[in-house]
């Protein structure tokens, strides 16, 4: 993921925005689909960095971050984390490859601290379809979502979206910041 400037910029933005939401404390961050650790490298040293990815790129991550070559979720990761909680979880360009999104979100929720943030960037179907981005579908993605479908899946998993934005990544993506449904820490009250 470090090979392209636009990808690095997008990952830096996701890491920075997520960290700003929980700033002012020591924290632990998990990057799902971390590839070569590019997103993790944008965190300051005081962040405990963890990355998981089923591909060989994860082997490039040095001792500066804990990493595992494993799919998410998996029994191996459950054993490795053994009750660990994360203040910030990120997943960029991962949801498109997930066959069971409810299991994915449920496991992420179980790893999130009470006031934690889950930053998700994924392809956004209205933008992909209106731009006729056929290369997205030719690439073999498992799914592409609209905001209403994502909201429904997240609601089923007792999570909620509290901030979002559209991005140009991969022809049209959406960046969402998610937390526990019962949390009011990030509610906007004018």
Pin down the residues of each PLM region:
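Extended interfacial segments that mediate partner engagement and assembly in macromolecular machines
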Residues: 1-59
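Conserved SAM-binding strand-loop segment of SAM-dependent methyltransferases
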Residues: 63-77
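A conserved beta-strand element that flanks and buttresses the S-adenosyl-L-methionine
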Residues: 90
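Hydrophobic adenine-recognition pocket in adenosine-nucleotide-binding enzymes
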Residues: 94
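Short, glycine-/aromatic-enriched active-site segment of Class I SAM-dependent methyltransferases
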Residues: 118-143, 147-151
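Conserved S-adenosyl-L-methionine
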Residues: 159-170
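Flexible, glycine-/basic-rich loop-and-beta segments that form/coincide
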Residues: 170-190
């Amino acid at each position: 993921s470090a090979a392209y400037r636009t990808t690095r910029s997008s990952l830096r933005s996701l890491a920075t925005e997520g960290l700003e939401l929980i700033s002012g404390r020591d924290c632990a961050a998990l990057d799902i689909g971390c590839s070569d650790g590019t997103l993790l490298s944008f965190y300051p040293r005081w962040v405990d960095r963890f990355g998981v990815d089923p591909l060989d790129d994860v082997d490039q991550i040095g001792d500066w971050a804990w990493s595992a070559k494993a799919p998410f979720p998996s029994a191996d990761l459950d054993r490795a984390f053994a009750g660990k909680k994360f203040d910030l979880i990120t997943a960029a360009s991962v949801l498109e490859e997930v066959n069971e999104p409810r299991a994915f979100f449920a496991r992420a929720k179980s790893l999130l601290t009470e006031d934690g943030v889950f930053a998700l960037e994924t392809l956004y179907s209205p933008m992909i379809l209106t731009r006729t981005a056929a290369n997205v579908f030719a690439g073999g993605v498992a799914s592409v979502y609209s905001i209403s479908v994502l909201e429904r899946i997240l609601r089923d998993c007792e999570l909620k979206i509290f901030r979002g934005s559209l991005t140009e990544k991969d022809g049209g993506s959406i960046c969402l910041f998610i937390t526990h449904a019962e949390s009011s820490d990030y509610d906007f009250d004018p």
